[in-house]
Each structure stands twice: as structure tokens, then as C-alpha cells.
């Protein structure tokens, strides 16, 4: 049986702004992992930015020394660099007081450059580990060719990385098996999982069972799965699995103490873990920033989120082109209609009328007396936005949200109230409903490009309306 090692990457993976753990928590974490007998402790990132005390995003290895005053014999202390984002002018010669090894991750287009960079790190006395970003994004031939170069370079470790949490067991076994077949046995084989499909721990355990029987391996994990988006394999679960099924070596109580203290404090300022949006990202091996952006900008159903991500090609899924996402969002929902006659009819209806746009903010109830007095005095035509607003005589209701439109069947509305909908509304549309083109009302680049109130204002502009009154936009 080969040597089996556990690497904890909590201090680097945490979704905390600027990795600002606080100095005391960093001390607690490193000491606790040492006491738990974790083999490899990742202390954080090395980056070009000036170091801020309390962060685990370091500029120089000297910044890490205060946390490693009592390095434990037999443990390896590491940091990670993202190729191209760390200038080696900041890296001092190795003197044993700080980290022992540096992990270098790289993207597909950097595959021909990374080993030269790694050689410069090793020339300063550090052990080096190398790992792809998104192993699934490489062809087998590319991986084999790179591993042959890795064998010549002889780093401490080479890792397979499931960057987007998209690997099922057969995928993990394929890529780690490929690496196992071609990677020299005197180089550690590693595996780093993300939990988008809730498979990080299962895949890590399967990897351990398959590979540790015949070679030295390392598996990455973080306490309570702490990591960006869906998180990672769980250090405590993997440690318990190794204790139970392979070798009794890790102190689970020490890990639990860290979760109760340091991880609990992190949960007060951030969150991570499985969610449907991250599940969707995992299905398509897509960057989670894509789903985060769509959710940030739009109130969108999960099935529609999936449909939009599916429109991205394999390259686009790995990037986060926000302008492209907005374009695809509109295209996905757009259902073009010939609306020239509808616009002409609306234009004639709105001509020379005072128009009040009535949104469903709290003030429409709180200030009802004043608003109704205004309506009576100005003899306004009232157009409600995305809702049946009770207590008012509505001339029109404008809908651009399918959910809101479907709710109207459960709301009381005067039969004379007319309805305007945009063409993105899904499902059956009632007769005598005016339908206008959704995409014609969109202006790209705006933060709230599909806000119902903004779409209605654009419709009124298209109908030649030069001015409107507005009420109820508070808290909306």
C-alpha cells in the first residue's frame, strides 16, 4: 500500500473577502490541523498585492512566518500560486522558516509555460506541486503529453482537479487513472474536488480506495467543506474515512473543535455549500460566476437558469462573459411577435392623456388618499405594473413577468381593465390581451435591463408618450 496523505486547503479556499480570517483564527487553524495530524497544511495564497494582516492572501513567504513559529516535524506547509498572477521577484530563497512547498495551478493556454515558472520556484529551494485548472477541459492526449514533461521535471506532486464540480465517479476514475498510468510512481498523485453535484466526498473516497493501494497519493479537503460556491470535500469526513477504512491516523476531535470555533466564526460572515444554481453549474461543467451573475441580475427560475447556461458553448461555460449572458438571457425568453398594430392602437389610446404609472410599492396603500386625489384632479389613465393593485380603478395592467401574470387569476380585477404583456410571458395568454415585443423594450448595459417599470416606460416612449406620472416605486 502506498502512503496516503490528507491536505487541508481551508485557509485558501474560504469564500471570505480578501481571505480575511484574522490573525488569531489563522493561528488556531494551523495549530489545530497540526494537532489533528493532517499531513499537508495549505496556509493560503501567494499574490502580488500588498499583504494585509489577518489575511491568508500573502505577498511574501515572510508574511507566513509568524504563523509557523512551531512547525511540526513531518508536516508539509504549502501555499498556492495562480500562474501569471504572482511575480517571483517577491519570492525569497527557502530558509525553512516559512512554507516548504508551493502549489502552482494553471489554465489550459498556460500548459507550455508553467513548468519553466515552476523551475524558477524550485531554484529558490522550494518543493513544487503542479495542477491543472479544470482537468476535464483537457484532451487525454494533452494530459499524457504534459505528464511526460512532469515526469522529467519531477515535482513533489501532480493533481487532477475537478474545478467545476462536474465529475461523476467514472470521470474521476478516468482522469486519475490516466494520470496513474503515465505519472512516475515517485511523484505524489493528488485529487482536488468541488461539491456542485454533492459528489466531492464520494469521489475522494473512491479515489483513495482505487489509488492508494499501489502508489503514494494526496487528497485535498477543507473543514466542513469550506470553499467558494458549493465548497469542497470535507476534511473531517475524509479523515474519518481514512481512519475507519485505511489507517487510524487523524484526531477527529481536533477537527471538530476547529469547526466549532474557527469555521463557526467564518459562517457568520459568509456561506458556502450545495445549492441548485451550483448544481446547474456542475451539470454543464460551467463556472459558477455565470449562474451567480444571472441570479444577481434577474429573478429567474432554476429550469430557465439551466436553459440559458446550456446555450453557452464549452469555452464560454468556463469563462464569465457577462455581456454575452445578458444577450442569451433576452434571446432565451424572447418570443418575437408582430406588434405594429398593437403599438398603433396603444399610441392612439395614450395620445394626449395624462398617464400614471402605478407600481406596487407600500406607498400606494399608505398614500392612497393623496394618489386618488391626484388621479381625480388630473383625470389620469392608470397603468399598474406587474400587479393587480387593490383599491384603484385600473385602466391597464402591464406584465413582463410570467409569475406575476399567472397570479392575476387569483386576484380580483375589474372586467374593464385591459392587459398588456411582453412576448416573453410563457404559457397561455388570455384573449383580448395586447402583446408587445419583449426584446424591443430591452436596452443592454443597464443594471435593471428587464425591470418591469423600465420596460413599461420604454413601451410608452415607443408609443409616443412624452411624459408620465409615477407612484409606488418605493421598495419595488
Question: Residue ranges of each PLM-predicted region?
Answer:
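N-terminal donor/sugar-recognition subdomains of glycan-related enzymes
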Residues: 327-379, 390-394, 406-409
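Short glycine/serine/threonine-rich phosphate/pyrophosphate-binding segments
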Residues: 111-114, 198-202, 364-367, 451-456
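Catalytic cores and adjacent flexible loops of soluble metabolic enzymes
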Residues: 1-340
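Structural motif
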Residues: 80-84, 107, 358-362, 399-402, ...
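Structural beta-sheet core signal
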Residues: 8, 79, 130, 191, ...
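Glycine-rich anion-binding loop/nest that anchors nucleotide
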Residues: 191-193, 216-223, 356-364, 386, ...
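Acidic/Gly/His-enriched mid-domain segments of enzyme catalytic cores or analogous surface patches
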Residues: 374-463, 467
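A short acidic, amphipathic alpha-helical/loop segment
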Residues: 89-93, 116-117, 203, 367-374, ...
